[in-house]
Amino acid sequence: MIGVQKMVWDKIRGMDRGSIFFIDDFIEIGSLGSVRLALMELKKQGLIIRPARGIYCYPKIRNEYSAIITPSPESIAEALAAKERVRIIPYGDHAACKLGLTGIQVSNLRYLTDGASRTINLASGKKIYFNHTSEVKIFDYCNETMQMIAAAIRVLTDEGLNAEKKRIIHKHLRTVPEEDFSKDIKIPPAWVGEIIIAIWEN
C-alpha cells in the first residue's frame, strides 16, 4: 500500500472491529475522490465491507474460519444518525417487533427523525426508511422502552392489543423507573397515555 490508501488503512486499523464509517471521515487525508478509490481497493482486498453506498465497515470476525459479521441495519441507522447529528426512533411495525409484540420479522426498518427524510438501500436488499417528523416532543422521552411502547401502541391501536400483547407491554413497563414513567407518560397523545396507564396499573 502506498500514499492515501495506506493512510486510510492505518486509520481504519486503529478503529474497533465493527466500526462503521464514511468517506468524509478521511477528509484530512486526501480528496473525496482519492479516499473513495482507496476504500474501493480495501474492499476488493476483503479488508473492509460496504453495507450500503457510501457506508463502510471494519467488520468483526467470527471464529477461526474468519467469517465476516455484517453490521446490523440498526447499527447502520444509529451510525448515520450520529454522523448527521439527528435523532431517530423506531416506529410502526419496527417498534412493535423490537418489543416482541408481533411474530412477523420486519425486513425494512422505519424510523422517525428530526432530520431529513431519506431511504438507505442496503447491500442485503433491505431498506432503512427515515421519515421526518415535526412532532419533536416524541424525542423527549427519558426512557427508550417508554418511547417504543408509545410508538407501538400508536400503530397497533387499542383494538390490536389483545391480552397477550398487554402482558408483554406490562412486562416491559416493569423495567421503567417510576421517575421516568411519570415524566414520559405526559408525552404521547392522550389516548395512548390512557392505554399505557391502564396496563401499568393492571
What are these regions (language model features)?
Residues 35, 91-92, 145:
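Amphipathic alpha-helical interface surfaces
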Residues 78, 127-135:
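Short amphipathic alpha-helical segments and their helix-coil junctions
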Residues 2-80:
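Short beta-edge/loop segments at beta->alpha junctions of small alpha/beta modules
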Residues 51-54, 87-122, 127:
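Short gly/ser-rich loop at a beta-strand->alpha-helix junction or flexible surface loop bordering the NTP-binding
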Residues 83:
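Basic nucleic-acid-binding interfaces
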Residues 53, 61, 93, 133-135:
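Histidine- and/or cysteine-centered catalytic micro-motif in compact active-site loops
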Residues 133-202:
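Hydrophobic alpha-helical interaction segments
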